[in-house]
Amino acid sequence: MEDKVNLAEKLALLAAPFQPGIVGRLNDHKLAVVKVQGRFVWHAHDDTDDFFLVLSGRLTIQLRDRDIELSPGELFVVPRGVEHCPKGEGAEVLLIEPEGTPNTGDAGGERTEPERWI
């Protein structure tokens, strides 16, 4: 059996925004926390949905046709294949996605982060 996880302590270990840290595993999915500061990159995940649960701050999930505004305790699931761009000012977010899913989806590039446990 694993130990309990304190998300506030794990978030404190993150030095920079948009660098997710894995905090747990659920079947073949990773649970990760990330800090969101500014705007990320437009991207899509062709093979999986993208789950965002706001822990603190405010997060906007930009879609091509609308913006989804999220406050603490609110979540949104971006359907697979849908282009989106997260942005926020100091938001802290829990992500759930299949292991091996790159944070930048199909966009790739310099903002792609390796999977790492914290």
Where are the model-predicted features located?
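Double-stranded beta-helix
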Residues: 3-11, 24, 89-118
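A cytosolic small-molecule/anion-sensing beta-strand core signal
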Residues: 27, 55-56, 71-72
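Short acidic/polar mixed-charge low-complexity motifs
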Residues: 29-30, 59, 66, 82
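General beta-strand recognition
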Residues: 32, 41, 60, 69, ...
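Short acidic-glycine-tyrosine-enriched beta hairpin
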Residues: 64-81
